[in-house]
Design a protein with these regions (language model features):
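Residue-level detector of beta-strand face positions
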Residues: 86-88, 125
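N-terminal active-site segment of His-dependent metallophosphoesterases
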Residues: 1-48, 52, 62-76, 82, ...
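A generic local structural motif
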Residues: 17-21, 40-43, 81-83, 100-104, ...
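Ligand-binding grooves and catalytic loops that recognize ribose/phosphate and carbohydrate rings
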Residues: 55, 59-85, 129-135, 142-143, ...
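Conserved beta-sheet core of the metallophosphoesterase superfamily
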Residues: 54, 93-95, 99-161
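Short connector loops at helix/strand junctions that flank enzyme active sites
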Residues: 50, 82, 89-91, 111
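Active-site metal-binding loops of divalent metal-dependent hydrolases
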Residues: 7-10, 35-37, 58-61, 99-100, ...
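Glycine-rich phosphate-binding loop signature in dinucleotide/nucleotide-binding domains
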Residues: 23-27, 89, 109-110
């Protein structure tokens, strides 16, 4: 199963559209968003994606009430999990959080095939035992290189996608 992984949109809609287009083109029917919509506008754009998008909140999400309203009333494919999520795909457990401090701790437990996080705006991949800890970088492009990732549940590996 191919999962689209992305984080830190910060209202950068052009790069968000690129990421969603790549996910659709490459066959990722389920996406994981590691936080920081910022305003509710990206939630509307993400809601147009045909598949499920599992989302956690980040520190930059100012109007969580409006984002939740959009998800619950207008775009039920947006699955809001609060500050963190524990998901299962094809018999494997995955954890999602915005914050790297918590992600590293979760990855260290040995309970997850992979843990996904954001916040730093810096792409990183680390193996902690058998667990892959992935920060897909930032959709925003604030640090210069907008990226997202495609994660393969069979191989436990990620392909980094440059959105520039």
């Amino acid at each position: 199963m191919l999962l689209g992984i992305f984080s830190d949109v910060h209202d950068q809609l052009q790069n968000l559209q690129r990421a969603l287009g790549v996910f659709k083109q490459r066959g990722a029917a389920t996406l994981i968003f590691c936080g920081d919509f910022c305003s509710p506008i990206p939630a509307r754009v993400m809601g147009a994606f045909a598949g499920e998008i599992h989302c956690v909140f980040g520190n930059g999400d100012g109007d969580r009430f409006q984002i939740a309203r959009i998800a619950h009333h207008d775009h039920p494919n947006l699955k809001l999990h609060g500050e963190h999520a524990e998901l299962e795909f094809e018999g494997h457990k995955f954890a999602v959080t915005h914050y790297p401090f918590y992600a590293k701790a979760l990855a260290s437990t040995g309970q997850y095939r992979a843990v996904f996080s954001g916040h730093t705006h810096v792409l990183s991949e680390e193996r902690i035992g058998a667990c892959l800890w992935l920060n897909p970088g930032e959709v925003m492009g604030w640090k210069g290189r907008p990226t997202c990732a495609l994660y393969d549940t069979h191989t436990n590996a990620a392909e980094i996608i440059d959105l520039a």
